[in-house]
Regions:
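C-terminal, non-catalytic macromolecule-binding modules
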Residues: 226-271
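His/Asp/Glu-rich metal-coordinating catalytic cores
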Residues: 1-128, 134-143
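Hydrophobic/aromatic beta-strand patches that form the interior of the parallel beta-sheet core
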Residues: 12, 29, 56, 79-82, ...
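A short, acidic, amphipathic alpha-helical segment used as a generic capping/interface helix at domain edges
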Residues: 223-229, 282-296
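Generic long, charged, amphipathic alpha-helical segments
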Residues: 264-290
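Hard-cation-handling environments
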Residues: 105-114, 120-243
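Single conserved hydrophobic/aromatic residue that forms the stacking wall/gate
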Residues: 295-305
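Short, conserved loop/helix-junction motifs that constitute active-site signature segments
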Residues: 74-76, 232-236, 296-297
Length: 305
């Protein structure tokens, strides 16, 4: 821990688009990668014997039209490009309108007297879901349940949500900025409850009020989400909504694959809840993103990772 704290004290933030000299012959500049809040692609200029070459490292390239954050920026040129290609061989396809779809799922679940459990990545995806739910509440798309409670039950997700709240002007897209200009926080709303302690987490499942629970981990292999699944998978009234990729071998993959029974905390739990997956939700660009990088002017070499 002492070593980690020592490293943190040496960190220095650099704004996007500011060209910085690290030492003789080495300069860098960060561009908004549009993947997560604060994610960056790196432009690197190397000069030796009077010759300068520019190297571009993409980092994770964000998906376009994500809520809250800006789309990725693409530089005009580079001599060498090192880029990710997570979904370089496929397209995400047309995106559904998530807000009415989510409102419908919430309405049906709460009407049954159940809970909507959303396994979610703590950084990025959780805040997207809050963005959608704020709009649902603002537009009164769920009827008969007042300001139904929404729990974010993940210490990391709570910390990330606080960071989103504190860095609005720098990183929010035009839609989120327009809400801020009206005095509206894009991810906060009546009925939102942030759970940090284990006692607060345990209390959620002893409250019989139908509710929405957003918790990590997104693939259900660790974290508090496992407790919420144990309390809700056996209930026909409840719904589990997956909003991200589920890797092979994970509990989340087993559930979207139709598992009728799963093991949680050494106990077999019957799967009676409604299992739903939102298509196309990804923080990574599909093939359109990497292709945009290959169109840079004057590139000599492109390396896919």
């Amino acid at each position: 821990m002492e070593d980690a704290l020592g490293v943190i004290r040496l960190l220095e933030g650099i704004p996007y688009h500011q060209r910085v000299t690290l030492s003789d012959g080495i300069q860098i500049r960060f561009l908004d990668a549009g993947h997560l809040l604060g994610s960056a692609s790196i432009e690197l200029w190397l000069t030796e014997d009077g010759v300068t070459k520019k190297l571009l490292f993409s980092g994770d390239i964000g998906n376009i039209h994500q809520p809250l954050i800006n789309d990725p920026e693409y530089p005009e040129s580079a001599d060498y490009v090192i880029m990710e290609s997570t979904y370089g061989d496929r397209s995400h396809g047309p995106k559904p309108d998530y807000v009415p779809e989510l409102a419908k799922i919430i309405q049906e679940t709460l009407d049954r007297g159940g809970n909507l459990v959303i396994p979610s990545f703590a950084v990025g995806r959780t805040q997207e879901m809050l963005y959608f739910i704020r709009e649902i509440k603002a537009e009164h798309l769920v009827h008969g349940h007042g300001e139904f409670p929404v729990y974010v039950d993940s210490p990391l997700a709570v910390e990330a949500t606080n960071i989103f709240r504190d860095h609005q002007k720098e990183c929010y897209d035009s839609d989120a900025a327009a809400l801020l200009a009206q005095g509206i926080n894009p991810i906060l709303f009546p009925g939102l409850k942030l759970s940090i302690t284990s006692d607060e987490s345990k209390a959620i499942n002893f409250n019989e009020t139908p509710k929405v629970i957003i918790s990590a981990s997104g693939m259900c292999d660790a974290g508090r989400i496992k407790h919420h699944l144990k309390h809700n998978l056996w209930r026909q009234e409840s719904t589990v909504l997956f909003v991200g990729y589920q890797a092979v071998g994970t509990l989340g993959r087993a559930l979207i694959g139709g598992a009728k029974e799963v093991k949680l905390f050494q106990e077999e739990v019957h799967v009676n809840a409604h299992i739903i997956q939102f298509p196309g939700m990804s923080g990574h660009a599909d093939q359109e993103g990497p292709v945009s990088y290959t169109h840079l002017r004057a590139h000599e070499t492109v390396l896919d990772l």
